Swiss-Prot record:
Compositionally biased region (Basic residues): 256-265
Superkingdom, natural source: Eukaryota
Organism: Homo sapiens
InterPro entries, sorted: PRR23
Family according to the record: Belongs to the PRR23 family.
Matching Pfam families: DUF2476
Annotated Pro residues bias: 226-237
Compositional bias segments (type: Low complexity): 1-18
Protein name in UniProt: Proline-rich protein 23B
C-alpha cells in the first residue's frame, strides 16, 4: 500500500523543517518577526523643526572706527561698541547682532594670500562665509555727535521757508545821496537781478546765526535822490561841436604891411 504525500495547502506546516539544508528556524524567525520601533535620527542642521535657531534673524553690522550702534529698546537705548580688534555678538530675543569693526574687514581684504595668525581675521572669514538665506548683511554708517548736530542745524537753516535769504548792500559801498535803480547781486541757486530788498520781520533765532558774506558786483543807472542836496554835474561839452555857451568868432584883422608887400610884388 502506497501512501500519498499530504498537500501543503491543506495542512500548512513550516517548510524549513522538511529541508535539511535550509536555514535554521531561529534565523528565519528573526527575519520574519515584526520590526521594532526604529531609533529616532538626530536632527540635522537642515531640519528647521529640530534646530529652532534657524528661524532667528542674524544681522551683520559693519561699524566705522570710533562709531557705535544704538538699539532702541522698550525702556532704554542700548549702545553697542565693539573693541577695534574684536567682534561683538549680541542676542536680543530672536534677533542676533554681529558687530564687526571696519578695520578688521580692511585687514582681511589687504591680506592678498598672506598667512597670519589673527583669530579675529579667521572669525570674520567664518561670519562672511555663512549661508546667505540665514544672514542679513547691513552696512551701518556712523558719525560723531558734533558733526551730526552741525549737519542738522545746517539743514534746518537751508529748509526754513519763513525766512528767505536776501542780500542787502553795505551802506559804505554806495555814494551818499545816490541809490541804484537796478542792481546785480550774487545769490546762490538764483539767477538775474532782484527787486529792492524789503525789511524782514524780527527773528528771535537770527541772533545765533553767523553773518553771511555780502557780494555786490556792480552798480548801474545811478539816479539822483530828490531830497538830496547833491546833484549830478552837467555833461561836458563835446570838442568841435558848437554849444550854447560857445564863444563868437573873432573879426578878421587886416593883413600886415609886410604881407601886403609880398602879395603885391
Amino acid at each position: 500500500m502506497v501512501s500519498r504525500p499530504r498537500s501543503p495547502s491543506a495542512f500548512p506546516a513550516p517548510w524549513w523543517g522538511q529541508q535539511p539544508g535550509g536555514p535554521g528556524p531561529a534565523k528565519r524567525l528573526r527575519l520574519e518577526e515584526p520590526a521594532g520601533p526604529e531609533p529616532r535620527a538626530a536632527p540635522s542642521l537642515e531640519d528647521p523643526a529640530g534646530d529652532p535657531a534657524v528661524d532667528a534673524l542674524t544681522s551683520i553690522v559693519v561699524l566705522a572706527a570710533g562709531c557705535a550702534l544704538r538699539v532702541p529698546l522698550d525702556d532704554v537705548d542700548l549702545v553697542l561698541e565693539p573693541a577695534p580688534t574684536s567682534i561683538l555678538r549680541v542676542s536680543l530675543g530672536g534677533h542676533t547682532l554681529i558687530l564687526i569693526p571696519e578695520v578688521l574687514l580692511s585687514s582681511v581684504d589687504e591680506r592678498s594670500g598672506a598667512q597670519h595668525d589673527s583669530s579675529a581675521g579667521l572669525e570674520v572669514d567664518v561670519f562672511l562665509g555663512a549661508v546667505r538665506e540665514d544672514v542679513v548683511v547691513e552696512l551701518e554708517f556712523c558719525a560723531s555727535v558734533p558733526e551730526i548736530a552741525a549737519q542738522e542745524e545746517a539743514y534746518e537753516e537751508d529748509a526754513d521757508p519763513e525766512f528767505p535769504e536776501l542780500r542787502m548792500d553795505s551802506p559804505t559801498g554806495s555814494a551818499a545821496g545816490l541809490y541804484p535803480s537796478s542792481r546785480s547781486m550774487f545769490i546762490p541757486y538764483r539767477e538775474g537781478p532782484i527787486p529792492e530788498p524789503c525789511a524782514l520781520a524780527p527773528n528771535p533765532s537770527s541772533e545765533r546765526r553767523s553773518p553771511r558774506p555780502i557780494f555786490d558786483l556792480e552798480f548801474r543807472l545811478l539816479e539822483p535822490v530828490p531830497s538830496s542836496p547833491l546833484q549830478p554835474l552837467p555833461p561836458s561839452p563835446c570838442v568841435g561841436s558848437p554849444g550854447p555857451h560857445a564863444r563868437s568868432p573873432l573879426p578878421e584883422r587886416p593883413p600886415c604891411k609886410a604881407r601886403r608887400r609880398l602879395f603885391q610884388a
